[in-house]
């Protein structure tokens, strides 16, 4: 599950280098979509699995994404590409740590 999150976030990050300011909102919505899907997927896990190491990884990854979405929303409103890239780098570091 966490690997899938990583792959999808890296995909968004690659698009970030190519986008203009109007695309920031689209990419942020895509990131929020990943978060929603992973939260729904976690909710369908059997209760025992939610408490396992895999469930903990999923919760940690979701927490990092929630934090990132909030920060990216603020940055996107200001259209600050450099800060957005710094935040995406932080997201990647946190996901690698999970």
Identify the role of each PLM range.
Residues 1-98:
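Feature detects long, helix-prone N-terminal segments enriched in hydrophobes
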């Amino acid at each position: 599950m966490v690997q899938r999150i990583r792959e999808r976030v890296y995909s968004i990050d690659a698009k970030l280098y190519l986008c203009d300011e109007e695309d920031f909102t689209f990419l942020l919505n895509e990131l929020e979509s990943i978060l929603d899907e992973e939260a729904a997927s976690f909710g369908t896990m059997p209760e025992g699995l939610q408490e396992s190491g895999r469930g903990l990884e999923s919760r940690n990854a979701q927490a990092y994404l929630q934090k990132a979405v909030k920060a990216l929303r603020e940055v996107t409103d200001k259209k600050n590409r450099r800060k957005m890239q710094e935040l995406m780098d932080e997201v990647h570091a946190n996901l690698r740590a999970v």
